[in-house]
């Protein structure tokens, strides 16, 4: 199992200072000293996908690859919005559509203070948003039948415009197949859609 992410450059870190210095060098027509350009990063990303595929690591989520049968069960449960309880200081949980986390203050945690912090009962809209933008991170996509079972409204009715737009742009595809309780439609991001997933997934957030 391999998780492959591009490095996020955060402010107030040595990498951020180096990246800023590289930007000045690039602007002057020079060769960066520290970090690759966006174009180089995309080539590295493409090469990573190809090398992993050659060695039997199939992509099952935007940034995760595994050999068959070795997908991370914890992560899959997270993307499918299954219940999970976080154990430990600062750990997050999702239980019966309520999100919360443990204290991140060591003194309080050592007193066995297990009071929920920042508890949020998710609205139906928030649940539908999470269903889409978490589920579409997986290459299996999202099931319209499961959406209906959970929310009692057709996925296509809620997200008609977003689906139409992304499919017309070649970022999303729909496939049909047999399910245990009848026919099912699954929506998946295309390879291009995965490459611009931040844009594609944002279409499923309610204004």
Per-region residue spans from a language model:
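Non-catalytic, well-ordered alpha-helical scaffold segments
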Residues: 126-133, 160, 194, 198
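Helix-rich C-terminal "collar"/helical-bundle subdomain used as an assembly and partner-interaction module
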Residues: 147, 171-174, 187
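C-terminal scaffold of the Radical SAM
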Residues: 1-153
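Short amphipathic alpha-helical interaction segments
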Residues: 153-168
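A short, conserved structural fragment
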Residues: 167-181
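Minor-groove-contacting beta-hairpin "wing" of winged helix-turn-helix DNA-binding domains
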Residues: 180-190
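Short solvent-exposed loop/turn micro-motifs enriched in small/polar/acidic residues
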Residues: 69-71, 165, 180
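Short, amphipathic alpha-helical interaction segments positioned at domain boundaries
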Residues: 191-207
């Amino acid at each position: 199992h391999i998780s492959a992410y591009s490095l996020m450059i955060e402010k107030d870190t040595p990498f951020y200072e180096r990246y800023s210095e590289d930007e000045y060098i690039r602007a002057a027509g020079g060769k960066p000293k520290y970090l690759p350009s966006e174009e180089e990063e995309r080539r590295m990303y493409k090469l990573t996908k190809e090398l992993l595929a050659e060695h039997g690591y199939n992509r099952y989520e935007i940034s995760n690859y595994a050999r068959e049968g070795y997908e991370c069960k914890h992560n899959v449960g997270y993307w499918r919005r299954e219940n999970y309880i976080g154990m430990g200081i600062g750990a997050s949980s999702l239980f019966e559509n309520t999100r919360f986390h443990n204290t991140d203050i060591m003194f309080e945690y050592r007193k066995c203070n297990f009071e929920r912090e920042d508890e949020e009962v998710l609205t139906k809209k928030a649940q539908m948003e999470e269903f889409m933008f978490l589920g579409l991170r997986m290459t299996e996509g999202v099931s319209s039948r499961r959406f209906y079972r959970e929310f009692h409204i057709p996925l296509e009715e809620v997200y008609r415009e977003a689906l139409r737009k992304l499919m017309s742009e070649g970022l999303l595809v729909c496939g049909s197949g047999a399910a245990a309780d009848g026919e099912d439609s699954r929506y998946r991001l295309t390879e291009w859609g995965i490459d611009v997933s931040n844009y594609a997934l944002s279409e499923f957030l309610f204004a």
